[in-house]
Amino acid sequence: MTETIKGTCHCGNLTAALNTEKKPQDMWLRACQCDFCRSHNMRSLSDADGRLEISVQDKSQFNRYHFGLNMVDFLICKLCGNYIGAVQQVDGQLFGIINANLTENRGERFGEAEHRFYEEETGKERSARRKAVWTPATLRIVS
């Protein structure tokens, strides 16, 4: 049975829908320990066998933030400041994660997040990991 986990930034400019066969309590919730993710209290959610669609209602109020190795687009709403998730192109395909804290019930049904440390990974290792565990994604800009 397919479940759709929906999320939105505070003002609704950015939305996400993760289609998965997994039950929420069985999904692997991660808490990256980099400064950026910790400052946003990010708990990331993905399913390599699922499908993620992130939509932007007003592109003038949308920011793709980059830092570190500049490999990933961190998707931030300029209106409310929320970070809904991130995407990266790997081998011509887009992969993404969503912020479980911005999903319905604010991620309460997912349980505790596993703290993850990625600073020792090379860019190639990061791309391989993301391709393996992030969700195949589309980014749709409405206007």
Identify the meaning behind each predicted range:
Residues 1-8, 13-143:
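A short Gly-Trp-Pro
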